[in-house]
Amino acid sequence: MRRLLSAVLAGCECIARMKSGKRVALRMPRIAFGLLLAGIAQSALAFDLDQLSAQLGKPEVVRGHFIQEKHLRALPQPLTSRGRFVLSRDQGLLWLLERPLQQDYRIDAQGIARRSEQGWQLVVQQSASAQQNRLFLAVLKGDSSGLRQDFELSLSGSAEAWTLDLTPRSVLLKQVFNAIHISGGALVQRIELQETQGDSTVLRLEDSQPGQALSDAERHDFQK
């Protein structure tokens, strides 16, 4: 009796599967078409490195304030500095430190210069420091082609809220950084540099505003 009942149930289940299979078969083309459309839409909406570069490189000038925190293993509290910055797409970067002391810096293709009573003076740098300055400019300007030379890049998010993770590729940078994390929206908002020795630097760019042109004083600083 049990064998007979099992056989009947198995037969019913087989018939049900056949009917269900027909329904599934009829639905499959529609499901596949829907998945195809979803894939096309996702690829069209994907935010990539070229779009990020175009977005960050669009403003001719960006002005704002910065807060820099240097986290050292030997100190319980970070070393904090504050100031203003002016980023020019064509000229470079003015980094105007206001606290805890006042000091103006300029970073451009020639290197880093410090303002003194005699004017702008180039700072003698080792190759590692010079490379870090080039990296800093490339990050703020969104120069992904320049960053690709020295880092593996991983971008996630959207144009309104994105994160770019940099893993050092070159031997020189591997000796300095474990990783660099950059995040932002229309402009760069936060940069975190994780160093190999356990120290880290967090840089927050606040109240950043795009502009059309440099002021006369800013243009003078870049030309001197």
Label the predicted regions.
Residues 115-138:
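Acidic/charged, solvent-exposed loop-and-adjacent secondary-structure segments enriched in E/D, K/R, S/T
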Residues 75-79, 84-89, 93-99, 104-107, ...:
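Structural recognition of beta-strand segments within beta-rich domains
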Residues 32-42:
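Bacterial N-terminal signal peptides
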